């Protein structure tokens, strides 16, 4: 049975503006009706900012031979046509649908949802939850911290709302990463993550699980225990986060990676990059060369992070953030 849960009315009408006059004239009642009666069979595919026709066919190679853009005699007008008829309800097997969504990341970053996702659970994939609820709740589908980017860059919001851009991430990867004035944050999960910064401006790398509270503010949802993350710097100015301020999820500023866990920092540039720590000064920490690396430890010897190739770095206090954290570089 066809499942149209993916359909986004606003995005469809923005993508195919010639449909709107037919609605205004009363010929059809909605973009959804147009798509079901005409657009789907015609091979229209822009029904959601979180579905990409090319990406779906590239990953689902068993589907491509049955799509009419590849095989004129195929039973499906498009990869989307297959997804609506079968793929959506096949769950995680068909969850690679867009560069704007990663099933592995969504499940790792929203670990509280795991019991609700599976063959016999309310949602057959994380993608189903994301499409029906997650995106509306401010959850995001990749390590790019989408809600904060849109909040800090209101000039691009109209382009996202209109459908000219699918997401803030699309803007950043196509334009923002080349603009020194744009900042971006990449976040991980409570599992082991590899994060790579992108861009010539300010990039923040946070290996732990981060979300937003009901007011749209950042909150930290894990603190690095039993997490072993790799944070890879960008060409721009990076901040590698090993300590966080107080938020709705933690009442006091908190160091990350206490106990079993640590961040491995790569591509650290002493001229441009910073490391964020909890507290007000370096007096609570030891910076100890270990082989070719520099180990960042608490006074008790708990390793929070290691800078690869940083044994000879002379890191010093740079500035206080005024929120219970400070920067060294």
Residue ranges and their predicted role:
Residues 129, 171, 185, 204, ...:
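Generic structural signal for residues positioned in beta-strands
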Residues 281, 287-329:
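Low-complexity acidic/polar repeat-biased segments
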Residues 5, 49, 99, 123, ...:
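Generic structural signal for beta-strand residues in well-ordered domains
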Residues 1, 23-27, 184-283:
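Acidic, glycine-rich calcium-binding repeat modules characteristic of RTX/beta-roll
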Residues 1-186:
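Charge-rich, low-complexity intrinsically disordered regions
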Residues 33, 81, 128, 170, ...:
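Residue-level detector of short, conserved catalytic/binding motifs and their immediate flanks
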């Amino acid at each position: 049975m066809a499942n149209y849960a993916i359909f986004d009315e606003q995005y469809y009408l923005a993508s195919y503006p010639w449909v709107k006059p037919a609605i205004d004239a009363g010929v059809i009642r909605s973009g959804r009706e147009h798509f079901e009666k005409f657009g789907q069979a015609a091979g229209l595919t822009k029904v959601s900012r979180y579905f990409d026709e090319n990406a779906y066919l590239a990953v689902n190679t068993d589907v491509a031979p049955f799509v009419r853009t590849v095989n004129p005699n195929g039973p499906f007008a498009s990869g989307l046509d297959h997804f609506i008829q079968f793929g959506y309800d096949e769950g995680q097997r068909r969850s690679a649908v867009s560069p704007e969504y990663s099933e592995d990341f969504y499940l790792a970053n929203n670990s509280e949802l795991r019991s609700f996702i599976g063959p016999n659970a309310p949602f057959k994939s994380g993608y189903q939850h994301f499409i029906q609820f997650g995106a509306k709740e401010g959850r995001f589908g990749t390590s790019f911290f989408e809600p904060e980017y849109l909040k800090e860059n209101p000039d691009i919001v109209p382009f996202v709302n209109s459908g000219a851009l699918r997401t803030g991430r699309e803007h950043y990867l196509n334009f923002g990463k080349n603009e020194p004035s744009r900042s971006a944050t990449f976040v991980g999960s409570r599992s082991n993550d590899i994060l790579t910064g992108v861009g010539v401006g300010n990039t923040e790398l946070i290996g732990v699980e981060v979300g937003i509270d009901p007011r749209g503010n950042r909150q930290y949802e894990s603190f690095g225990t039993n997490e072993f993350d790799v944070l890879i710097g960008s060409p721009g100015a990076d901040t590698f986060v090993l300590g966080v301020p107080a938020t709705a999820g933690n009442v006091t500023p908190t160091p990350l990676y206490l106990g079993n866990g640590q961040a491995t920092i790569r591509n650290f540039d002493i001229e441009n990059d910073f490391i964020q720590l909890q507290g007000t000064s370096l007096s609570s920490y030891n910076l100890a060369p270990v082989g070719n690396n520099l180990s960042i430890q608490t006074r008790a010897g708990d390793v929070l992070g290691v800078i690869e190739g940083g044994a000879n770095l002379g890191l010093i206090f740079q500035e206080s953030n005024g929120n219970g954290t400070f920067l060294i570089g």
